[in-house]
Amino acid sequence: MMRYALGVEYDGSEFLGWQQLGEMGPSVQATLQQALASVADASVRVVCAGRTDAGVHGQCQVVHFDSAVTRPPRAWILGTTTRLPSSVAVRWCVPTSEDFHARFSACARRYRYRLLNRQVRPALQHQFLSWERYPLDAQAMHVAAQMLLGENDFSAFRSAQCQALHARRELQAISVRRDAEVIEICVQANAFLHHMVRNIVGSLLMVGTGERPMEWIAELLAGRDRTMAGPTASARGLVFVGPLYPEKWHLPMEVSV
């Protein structure tokens, strides 16, 4: 058996999320596995670096799979992508060792959230942008966000459906910046809880509108009470940028540190 790592890009708008959940609806995982199976002429199971929810997009999701069929990377890339819908594409393929694991070998994961901040909702690229009509103070949001850095208990930003054994995560970097009418929030952590990024964004938006002071974010973190935090932000503006791996795995530079 040969193990391969793939970099996958997808528009999550029409999927019920990454994970295959029986016959409930289309998932990115099931769609990718079906295409890979056609190339391998055998069933294929993929393991991803980080599962995404319904409507969340992937810029460079990393997966691994095992196959008894040997194919050059180009054949896996082109053969699989031609069998995928236009909303999913394989960006790269790297043969790797059997001890590489897309999830457990990753040392960090990155997300990006983008929203349009103007009175009128977006018509172009609306599936990739959230929207907030009230003026936002991006600088205040950025300052407040820095209070979340470090290893903390993120229970205040954890969904009720989260199945993680504990809520401690290391938030390694977070930034909020404005580019004209678009506000971009970038987050990096060793791992994330269910809805963690969207719940953080929802709370930061309340700081941005002036509804809450910057110090409120630190109070939420210390309080560990989800009911006291802001609402869950829309999935529409969220992109899983991708995981990061140690250089020893010899993956493309965009996922290596």
Swiss-Prot record:
UniProt xrefs under InterPro entries: PsdUridine_synth_cat_dom_sf, PsdUridine_synth_TruA, PsdUridine_synth_TruA_a/b_dom, PsdUridine_synth_TruA_C, TruA/RsuA/RluB/E/F_N
Hydrolase as UniProt keyword: no
Keyword S-adenosyl-L-methionine: no
Main enzyme class: isomerase
BP GO annotations: tRNA pseudouridine synthesis
Binding positions for substrate per the UniProt entry: 111
Keyword tags: Isomerase, tRNA processing
Catalyses which reaction(s): uridine(38/39/40) in tRNA = pseudouridine(38/39/40) in tRNA
EC number in record: 5.4.99.12
Active site (catalytic residues): 53 (nucleophile)
Function: Formation of pseudouridine at positions 38, 39 and 40 in the anticodon stem and loop of transfer RNAs.
NCBIfam families: hisT_truA (TIGR00071)
Subunit structure: Homodimer.
Record-stated family: Belongs to the tRNA pseudouridine synthase TruA family.
HAMAP family the UniProt entry points to: TruA
UniProt name for this protein: tRNA pseudouridine synthase A
Source organism (scientific name): Xylella fastidiosa (strain M12)
